[in-house]
Amino acid sequence: MLQPKRTKYRKQQKGRVTGVATRGHRIAFGSFAIKSLEGGWITARQIEAARIAMTRAMKREGQVWIRVFPDKPITQKPAEVRMGKGKGAPEYWVACIKPGTILFESGGVSIETAQESLRLAAQKLPFKTKFIVRPDYVAS
């Protein structure tokens, strides 16, 4: 599972996901990608599930790039604990995703294989996504 090796602070405030992505919104590494159409949080487990779905569908050929990293700790109090007594312990990690962010990229495979593998990955994610192709892509 993805998580930071060390952080300056153990806990963070919730915050809001506002606006659209101005960084990480173009294909940088591969020829194909999935782009988020909605904002929200994606957990480290969801990223890992999508990565496994992609690599299985691609049958270990080509390459996969994960463009998001879960760097925000989400805290939770234990079950049946009264309110108060401070904030809960960090439970899992999320990445804050704005609309337009590139989530996963792939390359080195045919467009049909890439489309199918990214479709399977998109099913594991908590928001709507879109399959995109690099503008200068030429099928070989």
Swiss-Prot record:
Please list the disulfide bridges.
none
Q: What family classification does the UniProt entry report for this protein?
A: Belongs to the universal ribosomal protein uL16 family.
Cited function: Binds 23S rRNA and is also seen to make contacts with the A and possibly P site tRNAs.
Q: Name one GO biological process term.
A: translation
- List the source organism: Cytophaga hutchinsonii (strain ATCC 33406 / DSM 1761 / CIP 103989 / NBRC 15051 / NCIMB 9469 / D465)
Output this protein's name.
Large ribosomal subunit protein uL16
Taxonomic classification, please? Bacteria, Pseudomonadati, Bacteroidota, Cytophagia, Cytophagales
Q: Which GO terms describe its cellular component?
A: cytosolic large ribosomal subunit
Taxonomic superkingdom: Bacteria
